[in-house]
């Protein structure tokens, strides 16, 4: 039977509950356990698919097409286990499910209430489908005290009573701030956070305390006394250089041992930390470094590109180099010459995005990379802009544009109206809803055997995750290929372009999918490993 770990947060948001959950899962895996992680988000959106990147950060897409919280990306990267639709729930989805049941008459005329109907729906989500796992870690989004989080906290409180004794453990992640004027760390915020949690009926078994410096033993004893937890269960979570240092740091502090002890597992299997130690060693002992320009439109919030950032660092791990990122707002190039910004970098990456803002700047970045022979990686929107650049400057179609930006006489990029998903034909209309209407999830692509991208993959058949509503127009394929832009990958039915490349360029590849979503520290995605390898070669020329 599965054991459950519920992870809550207090004092402030953005403390790193997702990283903590992922790191603990990795530590339990290192001891040979089968682990699943689930995220419970209190917001009323059905999913984050239509939320602004500035509000929510990245939307992480799973193989089965779920648009989910970026924390699921951390879960996948740390554990290697692909997430799915059933690993993330929101208040919006819960209420939608309940309303659908009420309309069908499933509640037999009962008054539908938060307790028991909403809490039961949450509990069903937590408990469903866990037969093959030893541990299920549930991260509760938000902060203790938030109104939105109350039904979730009530649900996990009830589960603590309903699950067999010894199969539920509560971890509370808090902040212990340092006050310079006093010259000391303060325990009071954590005390109040635990008091709030206990007033709901949840007594934390373990405190995971974030701090920017070593927590004195006297302060740990104080937290133990006032928060009613064992002294050994007050675990300090100090700031570290990279997120991939977190599992090792938590292991040294005894988090995994304390969790197993709370479950009464003694003796516990010995952990194998060699893979994490190797990753940490490579990160802290690079044999060189490269600089990659990321030309985007959400550069003010790096969380909007979380998986992309990590995939680039994974490419650095594969090549034993440090990857420095030069963030450039694409709109800058619409009023300034790109050359001073891009001449000194070793690679240019144009990531995914939506809308017209910054598009011309991204087109200019693709033009610079093509003409100057700088490695270029265009992902989703970045591939589309590379095709528009080629249409304008190589084919001579001056009005080449995307129908996403408005009516155009030359829609080199256009709205997809239908595509195959397995054996089913998916259809969309331009006037349809935005939420959940994109081409989402893993789709197959077929690569030309003699293409550069097929050599990188070592295969001509690939499966990658997609999230897009627009696609390069197949009607322009012949003219673009005649100008030198090779359509190296297509959907199996030959209708949707998936990858493009220039044969006479050291490394210029555009992909319609999002390879960053499948990259792992232990298994860097081949495209990112190859891109960084090309950047290393470019660094010798600059």
UniProtKB/Swiss-Prot annotation:
Residues annotated as binding L-glutamine are 54, 353, 381-384, 404, 469
Q: What are the EC numbers?
A: 6.3.4.2
Tell me what controls its activity: Allosterically activated by GTP, when glutamine is the substrate; GTP has no effect on the reaction when ammonia is the substrate. The allosteric effector GTP functions by stabilizing the protein conformation that binds the tetrahedral intermediate(s) formed during glutamine hydrolysis. Inhibited by the product CTP, via allosteric rather than competitive inhibition.
Q: Name one GO molecular function term.
A: CTP synthase activity
Q: Locate the residues binding CTP.
A: 13, 146-148, 186-191, 222
Specify which residues bind ATP according to the UniProt entry for this protein. 14-19, 71
Residues engaged in binding Mg(2+) = 71, 139
Q: Where is the active site?
A: 380, 514, 516
Name the enzyme's class: ligase
- Which PROSITE patterns would you find in this protein's record? GATASE_TYPE_1 (PS51273)
- Where does the Glutamine amidotransferase type-1 domain lie? 291-541
Task: Show the segment(s) annotated as Amidoligase domain.
Answer: 1-265
Q: What GO cellular component entries does it have? A: cytosol
User: Its catalytic activity?
Assistant: UTP + L-glutamine + ATP + H2O = CTP + L-glutamate + ADP + phosphate + 2 H(+); L-glutamine + H2O = L-glutamate + NH4(+); UTP + NH4(+) + ATP = CTP + ADP + phosphate + 2 H(+)
- Pathway as given in its UniProt record: Pyrimidine metabolism; CTP biosynthesis via de novo pathway; CTP from UDP: step 2/2
Please name the GO terms of the biological process aspect recorded for this protein, alphabetically: 'de novo' CTP biosynthetic process; pyrimidine nucleobase biosynthetic process
**Residues binding UTP:** 13, 186-191, 222
Q: Which UniProt keywords apply?
A: ATP-binding, Glutamine amidotransferase, Ligase, Magnesium, Metal-binding, Nucleotide-binding, Pyrimidine biosynthesis
Reported function: Catalyzes the ATP-dependent amination of UTP to CTP with either L-glutamine or ammonia as the source of nitrogen. Regulates intracellular CTP levels through interactions with the four ribonucleotide triphosphates.
Family of this protein:
Belongs to the CTP synthase family.
Subunit-level organization: Homotetramer.
Q: What else is known?
A: CTPSs have evolved a hybrid strategy for distinguishing between UTP and CTP. The overlapping regions of the product feedback inhibitory and substrate sites recognize a common feature in both compounds, the triphosphate moiety. To differentiate isosteric substrate and product pyrimidine rings, an additional pocket far from the expected kinase/ligase catalytic site, specifically recognizes the cytosine and ribose portions of the product inhibitor.
What this protein is called in its record is CTP synthase
Classification of source organism: Bacteria, Pseudomonadati, Pseudomonadota, Alphaproteobacteria, Hyphomicrobiales
């Amino acid at each position: 039977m599965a054991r459950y770990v519920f992870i809550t947060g207090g004092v402030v948001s953005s403390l790193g509950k997702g990283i903590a959950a992922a790191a603990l899962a990795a530590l339990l895996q290192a001891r040979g356990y089968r682990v699943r992680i689930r995220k419970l988000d209190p917001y009323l959106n059905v999913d984050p698919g239509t939320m602004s990147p500035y509000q929510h950060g990245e939307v992480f897409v799973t193989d089965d097409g779920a648009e989910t919280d970026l924390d699921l990306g951390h879960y996948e990267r740390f554990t290697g286990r692909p997430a799915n639709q059933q690993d993330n729930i929101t208040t919006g989805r819960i209420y939608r499910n309940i309303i659908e049941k009420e309309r069908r008459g499933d509640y037999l005329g009962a008054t539908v209430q938060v307790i028991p109907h909403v809490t039961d729906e949450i509990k069903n989500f937590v408990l469903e489908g866990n037969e093959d796992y030893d541990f299920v870690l549930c991260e509760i989004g938000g902060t203790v005290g938030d109104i939105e989080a109350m039904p979730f906290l009530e649900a996990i409180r009830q589960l603590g009573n309903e699950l067999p004794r010894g199969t539920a453990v509560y971890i509370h992640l808090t902040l212990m701030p340092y006050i310079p004027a006093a010259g000391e760390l303060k325990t009071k915020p954590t005390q109040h956070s635990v008091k709030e949690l206990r007033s709901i009926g949840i007594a934390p078994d373990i405190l995971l305390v974030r701090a920017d410096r070593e927590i004195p033993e006297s302060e740990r004893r104080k937290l133990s006394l006032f928060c009613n937890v064992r002294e050994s269960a007050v675990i300090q979570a100090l700031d570290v250089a990279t997120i991939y240092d977190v599992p090792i740091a938590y292991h040294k502090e005894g988090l995994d041992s304390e969790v197993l002890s709370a479950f009464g597992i003694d003796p516990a299997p010995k952990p194998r930390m060699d893979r994490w130690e190797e990753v940490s060693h490579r990160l802290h002992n690079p044999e060189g470094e490269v600089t990659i320009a990321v030309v985007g439109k959400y550069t003010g919030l790096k969380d909007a590109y979380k998986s992309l950032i990590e995939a680039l660092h994974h490419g650095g791990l594969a090549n034993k180099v440090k990857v420095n990122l030069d963030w450039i707002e694409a709109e800058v190039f619409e009023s300034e010459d790109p050359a001073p910004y891009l001449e000194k970098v070793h690679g240019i990456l144009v990531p995914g995005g939506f809308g017209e803002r910054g598009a011309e700047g991204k087109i200019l970045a693709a033009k610079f990379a093509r003409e100057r022979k700088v490695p270029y990686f265009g992902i989703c929107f970045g591939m589309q802009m590379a095709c528009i650049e080629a249409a304008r400057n190589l084919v001579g179609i001056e009005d080449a544009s995307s129908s996403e930006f408005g009516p155009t006489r030359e829609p080199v990029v256009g709205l997809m109206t239908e595509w195959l998903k397995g054996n089913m034909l998916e259809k969309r209309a331009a006037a349809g809803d935005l939420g959940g209407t994109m081409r989402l999830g893993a789709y197959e692509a077929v690569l030309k055997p003699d293409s550069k991208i097929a050599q990188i993959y070592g295969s001509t058949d690939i499966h990658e995750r997609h999230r897009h509503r627009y696609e390069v127009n197949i009607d322009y394929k012949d003219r673009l290929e005649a100008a030198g832009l090779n359509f190296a990958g297509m959907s199996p039915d030959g209708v949707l372009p998936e990858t493009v490349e220039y044969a006479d360029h050291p490394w210029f590849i555009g992909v319609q999918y999002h390879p960053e979503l499948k990259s792992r520290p232990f298994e860097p995605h081949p495209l990112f490993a190859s891109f960084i390898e090309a950047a290393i070669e470019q660094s010798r020329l600059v």
